[in-house]
Amino acid sequence: MATSLGSNTYNRQNWEDADFPILCQTCLGENPYIRMTKEKYGKECKICARPFTVFRWCPGVRMRFKKTEVCQTCSKLKNVCQTCLLDLEYGLPIQVRDAGLSFKDDMPKSDVNKEYYTQNMEREISNSDGTRPVGMLGKATSTSDMLLKLARTTPYYKRNRPHICSFWVKGECKRGEECPYRHEKPTDPDDPLADQNIKDRYYGINDPVADKLLKRASTMPRLDPPEDKTITTLYVGGLGDTITETDLRNHFYQFGEIRTVTVVQRQQCAFIQFATRQAAEVAAEKSFNKLIVNGRRLNVKWGRSQAARGKEKEKDGTTDSGIKLEPVPGLPGALPPPPAAEEEASANYFNLPPSGPPAVVNIALPPPPGIAPPPPPGFGPHLFHPMGPPPPFMRAPGPIHYPSQDPQRMGAHAGKHSSP
């Protein structure tokens, strides 16, 4: 590319000659005393391809040298830093900022249209005071809650660290502690954050950092209005002892007519009832997760109807003050239903198995005195004497479970061992 002022390839009247760059606090560094080099028409802008003044500096000790990447005209059009291309107000990528402000800036990308657009914007910048952005961004006056939650308010100086030493990754670095690069394990090459393009970041398309922040914003808690359209009450918790009913009225009156304000000092909460559902929805949207009264952050939720609160308490086992009750240990389970009237006579309350008549056990008694005992089996005639049922006092109560129940146990009959 020809860089002489006499060449007609580019409009040399629009070459940039600046005295100081447009930088964010992170890129500038934490050291207030820095030495910065200035190279007039050193490189061409990576967006508009026009030569501009390049600044180079070191943001701190053990940090890498940084330089400006885009011209000041492109920086002012998007209100971004000339080095990192992040928004100067929120510290966020352009794609996240545009999504939060709900607008899309369609800048031309062809060479001729881009040059014409840049010249018109430079004319608009020269007619302004230079304190506010121009173009579509200057017309966006409303702020977004998502941007306030995702905004990076403090500098992150670790972003200025040196790059990873490629020789150390291969195990060939011989500098040791004198190596100006980092000796750390590199990130996964398949990680989307490892592949970033400066043009994609400037135009707000296919930015992996912006996609990560937008996914985080989508998972943030939200306060959805209840399905019951009759609910117009908001719950405000965490009042403390310093916030009064007047303070709450002074904040919520801007959203609509307030019907009642009930402050419960014991629970340090309040219930604000609006006259219309629309006013309650606007108040909930504007106050959720960002209500601060007298230096105290308050919690805002939708109120619930009495029927819904009663059902939830019965289901969860909670008291009126919100204390969850623990189950009492050792209590029996649910009792079975009582038996019918005709089954009461035969009801088995102890779940015992049905028992039949008591078993009869034939016990061989010793012969009376003076009578010889019968011969052992096999030595005498086989005689069968039918025996009648034993008397009631000789019947066994049932099967034997313990040794002491055995009638043949030694010592069970005193007459067996007595002499005749």
From Swiss-Prot:
<keyword id="KW-1017">Isopeptide bond</keyword>
<keyword id="KW-0597">Phosphoprotein</keyword>
<dbReference type="InterPro" id="IPR000504">
    <property type="entry name" value="RRM_dom"/>
</dbReference>
<keyword id="KW-0507">mRNA processing</keyword>
<dbReference type="GO" id="GO:0046827">
    <property type="term" value="P:positive regulation of protein export from nucleus"/>
</dbReference>
<feature type="compositionally biased region" description="Basic and acidic residues">
    <location>
        <begin position="309"/>
        <end position="318"/>
    </location>
</feature>
<dbReference type="InterPro" id="IPR048995">
    <property type="entry name" value="STL11/RBM22-like_N"/>
</dbReference>
<feature type="modified residue" description="Phosphoserine">
    <location>
        <position position="4"/>
    </location>
</feature>
<dbReference type="GO" id="GO:0008270">
    <property type="term" value="F:zinc ion binding"/>
</dbReference>
<dbReference type="GO" id="GO:0048306">
    <property type="term" value="F:calcium-dependent protein binding"/>
</dbReference>
<feature type="region of interest" description="Disordered">
    <location>
        <begin position="303"/>
        <end position="343"/>
    </location>
</feature>
<dbReference type="GO" id="GO:0042307">
    <property type="term" value="P:positive regulation of protein import into nucleus"/>
</dbReference>
<dbReference type="GO" id="GO:0045292">
    <property type="term" value="P:mRNA cis splicing, via spliceosome"/>
</dbReference>
<dbReference type="GO" id="GO:0005737">
    <property type="term" value="C:cytoplasm"/>
</dbReference>
<dbReference type="GO" id="GO:0033120">
    <property type="term" value="P:positive regulation of RNA splicing"/>
</dbReference>
<keyword id="KW-0862">Zinc</keyword>
<keyword id="KW-0479">Metal-binding</keyword>
<feature type="modified residue" description="Phosphoserine">
    <location>
        <position position="102"/>
    </location>
</feature>
<dbReference type="GO" id="GO:0000974">
    <property type="term" value="C:Prp19 complex"/>
</dbReference>
<feature type="cross-link" description="Glycyl lysine isopeptide (Lys-Gly) (interchain with G-Cter in SUMO2)">
    <location>
        <position position="149"/>
    </location>
</feature>
<dbReference type="GO" id="GO:0036002">
    <property type="term" value="F:pre-mRNA binding"/>
</dbReference>
<keyword id="KW-0539">Nucleus</keyword>
<keyword id="KW-0694">RNA-binding</keyword>
<dbReference type="InterPro" id="IPR036855">
    <property type="entry name" value="Znf_CCCH_sf"/>
</dbReference>
<feature type="modified residue" description="N-acetylalanine">
    <location>
        <position position="2"/>
    </location>
</feature>
<feature type="cross-link" description="Glycyl lysine isopeptide (Lys-Gly) (interchain with G-Cter in SUMO2)">
    <location>
        <position position="290"/>
    </location>
</feature>
<protein>
    <recommendedName>
        <fullName>Pre-mRNA-splicing factor RBM22</fullName>
    </recommendedName>
</protein>
<dbReference type="InterPro" id="IPR012677">
    <property type="entry name" value="Nucleotide-bd_a/b_plait_sf"/>
</dbReference>
<keyword id="KW-0813">Transport</keyword>
<dbReference type="GO" id="GO:0071007">
    <property type="term" value="C:U2-type catalytic step 2 spliceosome"/>
</dbReference>
<dbReference type="GO" id="GO:0005634">
    <property type="term" value="C:nucleus"/>
</dbReference>
<dbReference type="Pfam" id="PF00076">
    <property type="entry name" value="RRM_1"/>
</dbReference>
<feature type="cross-link" description="Glycyl lysine isopeptide (Lys-Gly) (interchain with G-Cter in SUMO2)">
    <location>
        <position position="139"/>
    </location>
</feature>
<dbReference type="GO" id="GO:0071466">
    <property type="term" value="P:cellular response to xenobiotic stimulus"/>
</dbReference>
<comment type="subunit">
    <text>Component of the pre-catalytic and catalytic spliceosome complexes. Component of the postcatalytic spliceosome P complex. Interacts with PDCD6; the interaction induces translocation of PDCD6 in the cytoplasm. Interacts with PPIL1.</text>
</comment>
<keyword id="KW-0963">Cytoplasm</keyword>
<feature type="modified residue" description="N6-acetyllysine">
    <location>
        <position position="212"/>
    </location>
</feature>
<dbReference type="InterPro" id="IPR000571">
    <property type="entry name" value="Znf_CCCH"/>
</dbReference>
<keyword id="KW-0747">Spliceosome</keyword>
<dbReference type="InterPro" id="IPR035979">
    <property type="entry name" value="RBD_domain_sf"/>
</dbReference>
<dbReference type="InterPro" id="IPR039171">
    <property type="entry name" value="Cwc2/Slt11"/>
</dbReference>
<comment type="similarity">
    <text>Belongs to the SLT11 family.</text>
</comment>
